[in-house]
Regions:
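Conserved catalytic motifs of ABC-family nucleotide-binding domains
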Residues: 88-98, 108
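Conserved ABC ATPase signature
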Residues: 133-137, 141
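H-loop/switch region of ABC-family ATPase nucleotide-binding domains
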Residues: 193-194
Length: 237
């Protein structure tokens, strides 16, 4: 189990004349899931990339428990702590096993690598497609391979950009169950999605991004599924 607790404050970024994020605050904790909602271009992906240390904001501070520092000073630590998964994860040439091997430490012995890959295949339910070419996988299968690669890296924070877009129901359920498993293991999750209702069983905090501002809704404060859906209807467009 991890003991991750990171607080982002006063995050702001502008692209040209558009203020994408302004005064954004975000608290990330082990074993909890934040769901980011908002229209295209609202800043969901930008915020994920800032958390991952991949996109520098114009302003902002990070507190990892040892003090409040400028984002730029914490950039390397964020990159070491978080794994960011793109909406369309890249697959390397070769089969699924080869793709999983890319996530392993090069110092591992051959037996250790085999054991770790086999564990990942079993954990993600990929045994039946282990020898398949990764380039030919369906969208749902690719996403599960990407999550398994992330699992092999032991992330403290996993950031997912639209992870279930264009998936059939079976693939959605499999993917969300993997995320539930990660959350139960203590991984902090931050997910962006246009389909927030599918993440009801996973979400602890629902954040709506609009006009550069983030509005929060804590789903664990005695909130029933009816309240969750009511909030989606009223606030998530």
């Amino acid at each position: 189990m991890y003991n991750t607790h990171i607080y982002f404050s006063d995050i702001g970024i502008r692209f040209g004349h558009q203020q994408v994020l302004s005064g954004t605050e975000l608290e990330i904790m082990s074993g909890r899931c934040i769901l980011l909602c908002g229209n295209n271009g609202s800043g969901k992906t930008t915020l994920l990339r800032i958390i991952a240390g991949l996109q520098a904001p114009d302003s902002g501070f990070v507190n990892t428990g040892i003090g409040k520092y400028d984002w730029n000073r914490c950039r390397q630590q964020l990159r070491q702590t978080a794994v960011y998964l793109h909406q369309q994860p890249y697959m390397f040439d070769g089969d699924v096993i080869s793709n999983l091997n890319f996530s392993l430490n090069s110092n591992l012995s051959r037996k250790q690598r085999i054991d770790r890959v086999n564990s990942a295949l079993e954990w993600a339910g990929l045994e039946n497609i282990a020898k398949n070419s990764a380039k030919t996988l369906s969208g749902g299968e690719r996403q599960r391979v990407a999550i398994a690669r992330a699992w092999l890296r032991d992330p403290q924070i996993l950031l997912l950009d639209e992870p279930i877009t264009n998936m059939d129901q079976d693939s959605r359920l499999r993917t969300i169950q993997l995320l539930i498993n990660l959350k139960q293991q203590g991984v902090a999750l931050v997910v962006s999605s246009h389909d927030p209702v599918h993440f009801e069983s996973l979400t602890d905090t629902l954040l709506q991004i609009s006009d550069g501002r983030v509005h929060g809704f804590n789903t664990t404060d005695n909130v029933t599924p009816i309240h969750y859906r009511k909030h989606l209807h009223e606030h998530v467009k």
